[in-house]
Amino acid sequence: GECIRHCPHHAKHTRRDFLSDLDRFEYTVALPAPSLYSQFNNVRDNDILLTALTLVGFDDVFEVSAGAEIVSELSRTYINEHPELHPLISTACPTIERLIRVRFPGLIPHLLPLLPPMEAAAILARRRAVEKTGLLEDKIGIVFLSPCPSKITFIHEPLGMGKSNIDAVLAIKDIYPVLLSHMKEAEQHPISHTLSGRIGKGWAISGGEAYGIISDHYLAADGIENVIRVLEDLEDEKFLPGLQFVELNACSAGCVGGVLTVENPYIAKAKVKQAFKYEPVLHMHCADLPEFRPEDFLWTQKVSYEPVYTLGANIFESMEKI
């Protein structure tokens, strides 16, 4: 999203869907990113915001932060079971994953082979919608509300899996004014949709994912320049003894700093931290999910090196292209 953020002529745009594009589905489920909550002022009851999504036109809502709590639990297990791969690197930010593929291939074995929270939430949301409605899966639209173009790119060109479980993507900045106009009505009769606590909602900010790992042996960095410096040091094996987990976010302050959000990222980060005092620690547990299988949330395809800096497969082919 840096090119969108810095282009002086505003010539760059994001490939995304709009509310009018969702008419092709018989039933739609909104997947609000954890960063959505911090875009609004004085909303202490998240159910007001989630109810507003149903007033906008969605049939149901499933929090991505609920998927994040499942991924946090699976991450803790994987980190504890694979000390030989420490430090493991988060794969929640698609920009980081792609950066490692093209520039730091030696770190690929350290990538945490888990689906990102939005995909985990999409799997769970679709199962619930099928059970609730009896509709075929292709009649149900799973719609992600995204804070950044990187996650949109992941949905169209996923890594670690063949096809995304998400059918459409709306930008938070597009849905924001529509939601704002429905907040007063939602406040009158909020419906309970909340499925997550601090651990899930904390993924919106830098350090939030590491908070869910429940370990002191982690490193968290945000901002693409800082991330590159950390990756260079990791490649040179310059890291703290006992380091288990590395959380990296391309956007400053974390996902709240995405180019498709509306609030100042540091104000949004402060809002997330303030909201923690009103939240339980955790809502979702793997053991509570019917027919839960950890392998459903693991990579199904390997992520491999992508040499974008070479002209050809060998030196002769490269010379011909010069």
Question: Predicted segment positions?
Answer:
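Long, contiguous juxta-domain segments that are non-catalytic but functionally important
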Residues: 1-13, 17
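Iron-sulfur-associated redox domains of electron-transfer enzymes in respiratory
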Residues: 15-322
